[in-house]
Amino acid sequence: MMKKGTIILVAPTAIFSAILLYLVIWNAVMSFMNWSLLNSKPTFVGLETYSIVIRTFQFTNSLLHSIELSVILVVIGNILGIFIAALLYFLNSNKARSTFLSIVIYPLSISMAVNGLIWLWLFNIHIGVDWLLVRIGLPQFPWLSSTSTMFPSLVLVSVWAYTGIAALFYLAGFMNIDKTIVEAARLDGTSAFKILYKILIPNSLNSFIIATALLFLFSFRIFDLPYVLSGGTTNIFLQTSELYMYYLFTVEYFSQATAVATMITLIATIIIIPYALTVIRRWIRR
């Protein structure tokens, strides 16, 4: 029999999972219906709604932005995460390591909406980075005022906000490696860089899998940062699939909104499940 303490811990998770699963299934079912708040009897239309959504420019544009952002953040986030974790790992002072780690994960301790507001102020031409550039004799940079730099600015903010996740998992992986191996390499005169790519990185596959999965999920389903930076949902240069879904709800295109939500969930699930299964298999083998 299950212990009482185990039941108390498992029950809330099971209830939450059941509610979440119900909502996902309900959303998927409603995506095959033509419905609105004024229509008490939704009518079945099959894949017609999906066909309409897929043919729209906004959907393909927003989905492309989500995919591009995911790929860029996964690549840059992992690279920066590894090097930040390595710098923290090779610090001799635990106090210094804790201080710098707090700085790295600071963006994760506040909401993404607040992160977006901070960068919105930094991009302000009167009080932000551009003001400083002018003061030192450099030209201003059109962070959010040019269509060609809006998306790169979103990428910059996203990398700053989420790289700490990767760094945290890589540092945990590095710290879990047998220190005698690292010390032996140091005694042999091996440089820190060689220790990193010959010992630390090869033994941190679990960290890579988890960091990649989380970076993908956060970037593919990003909402707060582009919403704050663009000031709404209709800026096509910063519109992600989540923003487009929210926009459809605000204009009461509920059938199309549920279809977009279902496709977002399906894409994320298809990509994440193999990662989850890989991690589970590795833990079972251990």
Curated annotation (Swiss-Prot):
<feature type="domain" description="ABC transmembrane type-1">
    <location>
        <begin position="63"/>
        <end position="275"/>
    </location>
</feature>
<dbReference type="InterPro" id="IPR054947">
    <property type="entry name" value="GlcT_permease"/>
</dbReference>
<dbReference type="Pfam" id="PF00528">
    <property type="entry name" value="BPD_transp_1"/>
</dbReference>
<keyword id="KW-0813">Transport</keyword>
<dbReference type="InterPro" id="IPR052730">
    <property type="entry name" value="Sugar_ABC_transporter"/>
</dbReference>
<feature type="transmembrane region" description="Helical">
    <location>
        <begin position="103"/>
        <end position="123"/>
    </location>
</feature>
<keyword id="KW-0812">Transmembrane</keyword>
<feature type="transmembrane region" description="Helical">
    <location>
        <begin position="71"/>
        <end position="91"/>
    </location>
</feature>
<feature type="transmembrane region" description="Helical">
    <location>
        <begin position="260"/>
        <end position="280"/>
    </location>
</feature>
<dbReference type="GO" id="GO:0055085">
    <property type="term" value="P:transmembrane transport"/>
</dbReference>
<feature type="transmembrane region" description="Helical">
    <location>
        <begin position="6"/>
        <end position="26"/>
    </location>
</feature>
<comment type="function">
    <text>Part of the ABC transporter complex GlcSTUV involved in glucose uptake. Responsible for the translocation of the substrate across the membrane.</text>
</comment>
<dbReference type="GO" id="GO:0005886">
    <property type="term" value="C:plasma membrane"/>
</dbReference>
<dbReference type="InterPro" id="IPR035906">
    <property type="entry name" value="MetI-like_sf"/>
</dbReference>
<feature type="transmembrane region" description="Helical">
    <location>
        <begin position="154"/>
        <end position="174"/>
    </location>
</feature>
<keyword id="KW-1133">Transmembrane helix</keyword>
<feature type="transmembrane region" description="Helical">
    <location>
        <begin position="199"/>
        <end position="219"/>
    </location>
</feature>
<keyword id="KW-1003">Cell membrane</keyword>
<keyword id="KW-0472">Membrane</keyword>
<comment type="similarity">
    <text>Belongs to the binding-protein-dependent transport system permease family.</text>
</comment>
<dbReference type="InterPro" id="IPR000515">
    <property type="entry name" value="MetI-like"/>
</dbReference>
<keyword id="KW-0762">Sugar transport</keyword>
<comment type="subunit">
    <text>The complex is composed of two ATP-binding proteins (GlcV), two transmembrane proteins (GlcT and GlcU) and a solute-binding protein (GlcS).</text>
</comment>
<protein>
    <recommendedName>
        <fullName>Glucose import system permease protein GlcT</fullName>
    </recommendedName>
</protein>
